[in-house]
Amino acid sequence: MSIAQDRGIVFKLLSIYRAAAGIFMALAQLIVIFFGYCDFKIKGYRIASYNAPTFASSFIILAVCLLLVVVLENPEVKVTNSENSLFSALKQFFRVERKKLISCLILLWSMFLSSFIMSEVVYFMPLFLTLHVNWDTKFQGIAFMVASILGVTGSYFAPKLINVGCSCGRAKDGGLEESDTTGSETVEVKKKDSLYSGQVFLSIFALFVSLLGQAFMIGASEALKHKSMPPTNSGIFFSAGMSITLLGYNFLASSIPALFSMYIDPKLKVQLMPSIGAISGIGKLVAPIVLAALYGTRLGLSIAVGFGMILVAVSIPPLIWLRKKRC
């Protein structure tokens, strides 16, 4: 199997995994919808729609953790000096040629950005739909479930969009592959280039899709603020913006890890995996802090989502550079 085919299959499998995870995340909103009907008291403490889904989710997570403790086995791990191992891996990462290092840093920033975008949607969804539109928890659950299902189509269609570009490249090189065996290496290089260009283009396209979704969210907020649209219509408009933003997020989250794997040695990537995961996780930790501070200003939601749009916009030129300056 060629390297291009192998990478294409891995990219497709990762996208399928993301699509499945997104669908289960969307279906999890059924818990929110079901427990949104709760309204009773336990020794004076009221369990209602605003806290019942949280309690239910906590107990489900606890049950899953206990199940994993019973089912999973703890494999034997070879004892190594993890500090030296991580330190040497970091030194090896930063000692690569300058252009490759810049490319890796651009992709790491894109991973951070994708998690920031996701947190932006999750943060503002309850704020806007509860405080401004006055939707009940169950209606918010329905809105987020629909937005998640529509957004997760990004993971489903990502490999198909990549395959369109790759199939065009294969059609052009088909004659060479059949007529000249010595040209197989050239064909393989062209396939890899086609796969790479397609994934970078998908990443750039994802950022533009995210910009469109964020613009919808700001538009819904401003329309409600100036009473240009009824609250229910504003809520639907805002949910449409969430769907589009999540679509861009899933496109980006499908393509960026695959691109990063092209720039880094597989063994080095395994050693740095905790650090790479931490960079993505930082986006989810930073987003609520930054967005809450901006939301507290006079412009509120508009300036907070606008800040996210600025981050997305400034990330487009580096990806364009990445497409032109492949290492």
Curated annotation (Swiss-Prot):
It is found in: Membrane. Residues 1-19, 73-104, 163-199, 257-275, 322-327 are cytoplasmic. Residues 41-51, 126-141, 221-235, 297-300 are extracellular. The keyword Membrane applies. The chain crosses the membrane at residues 20-40, 52-72, 105-125, 142-162, 200-220, 236-256, 276-296, 301-321. GO terms for cellular component: endoplasmic reticulum; membrane. InterPro entries: MFS_trans_sf (IPR036259). It is a multi-pass membrane protein. Keywords: Membrane, Transmembrane, Transmembrane helix. This is Uncharacterized membrane protein YNR062C.
